[in-house]
């Protein structure tokens, strides 16, 4: 599977060929997680509508929920203005974080809202 050249030409990748992907819950607007993608992971996501990412530590692709059952159905994918990050607008089934919480950003508040 290959990424459409028109999309690939707009992406800015790091030295490892990766770019960041932010998953946002469609119904709440919550930022769920940040992961890495490469062209293949993005192509798979666009083709299947399943959040597919690249693990730097395992050096392999993974589909969110493939083992946990906590799946992401991808409704939209947007490219940011710099071309180095994609936003996935998803329906999250179950926890998004590997710790079992709904979002990876709910436990360590460094500055709370007034």
UniProtKB/Swiss-Prot annotation:
Record: residues binding Zn(2+): 81, 97, 104
UniProt-listed InterPro entries: PRA-CH, PRib_AMP_CycHydrolase_dom, PRib_AMP_CycHydrolase_sf
Binding of Mg(2+), residues: 80, 82, 84
Disulfide bonds: none
MF (Gene Ontology): magnesium ion binding; phosphoribosyl-AMP cyclohydrolase activity; zinc ion binding
EC number: 3.5.4.19
Keyword terms, alphabetized: Amino-acid biosynthesis, Cytoplasm, Histidine biosynthesis, Hydrolase, Magnesium, Metal-binding, Zinc
Cofactor note: Binds 1 Mg(2+) ion per subunit. Binds 1 zinc ion per subunit.
GO annotation, biological process: L-histidine biosynthetic process
GO cellular component, one term: cytoplasm
Top EC category: hydrolase
Cofactor(s) needed for function: Mg(2+); Zn(2+)
Catalytic activity as recorded in UniProt: 1-(5-phospho-beta-D-ribosyl)-5'-AMP + H2O = 1-(5-phospho-beta-D-ribosyl)-5-[(5-phospho-beta-D-ribosylamino)methylideneamino]imidazole-4-carboxamide
Gene3D superfamilies on file: Phosphoribosyl-AMP cyclohydrolase
Location of the protein in the cell: Cytoplasm
Pathway(s) annotated for this protein in UniProt: Amino-acid biosynthesis; L-histidine biosynthesis; L-histidine from 5-phospho-alpha-D-ribose 1-diphosphate: step 3/9
Similarity comment: Belongs to the PRA-CH family.
HAMAP family, A to Z: HisI
Subunit structure, as described in the record: Homodimer.
Function: Catalyzes the hydrolysis of the adenine ring of phosphoribosyl-AMP.
Annotated protein name in UniProt: Phosphoribosyl-AMP cyclohydrolase
Organism: Rhodococcus opacus (strain B4)
């Amino acid at each position: 599977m290959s990424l459409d050249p028109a999309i690939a030409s707009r992406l800015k990748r790091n030295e490892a060929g990766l770019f960041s992907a932010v998953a946002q819950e469609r119904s709440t607007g919550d930022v769920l997680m940040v992961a890495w993608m490469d062209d293949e992971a993005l192509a798979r996501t666009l083709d299947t509508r399943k959040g597919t990412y690249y693990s730097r530590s395992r050096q392999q692709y993974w589909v969110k929920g493939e083992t946990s059952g906590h799946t992401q159905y991808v409704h939209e994918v947007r490219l940011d203005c710099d071309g180095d990050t994609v936003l996935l607008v998803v329906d999250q089934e179950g926890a998004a974080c590997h710790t079992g919480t709904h979002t990876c950003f709910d436990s360590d508040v460094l500055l709370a809202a007034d």
